Amino acid sequence: CIEPLRSPAFTAADIVRGIREGGGQSFTICVEMHGRFNVATAIRVADAMRPYDPLFIEEPVPATDVGAMREVQLATTLAVATGERLRSTAEYGPYLEQRACRILQPDVGHMGGITGLKRLAHMADSHYVTVAPHCCWGPVQAMATAHVSSTIPNLLIQEDNHWRTGVFEETVVGGYTFDPQYIDVPEV
């Protein structure tokens, strides 16, 4: 018996549907696509997921292809997010100028630190684009990102990986409060 090949759009939508039905509307879903699709498939996947209300789809096509990202963003009502691997405001410029996404995900470690991330956030704000900083490398990066996030008007969310172990508590003076709803920004 040969079974029909399932479309990636339906497989992805089934996963997101299961998450939404299992948890209801009490939390936000962000879908990481990691540049796995071509434009046509990315649009089909976005359309199939739309009923389950994800906050955004992240890098539905390879992040290095601004034109492809723009095509997807223009074809869907879902917000497209990108940028965690970009390393300068110059690299982000085409995404903003071509309106290729609605959300930027800069990484403070790639952007030249706090000043670079803050500069990019202001640049994005001038294009009506929100920022959801990427943050996955450890306690120093988490605190630097939290400090920038607390000062930018176009912050959407801040990524945070709470997989950490005691290293966070040992590194951050005064501890580190993690709650899915907020981050305490310590004074140093």
Regions found by a protein language model. Name each.
Residues 1-76:
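Metal-dependent enolase-superfamily TIM-barrel catalytic cores that perform enediolate-based chemistry
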Residues 47, 53-56, 64-182:
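Shared catalytic-loop signature of beta/alpha-barrel
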Residues 183-188:
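Short, intrinsically disordered, charge-balanced linker/junction segments flanking boundaries
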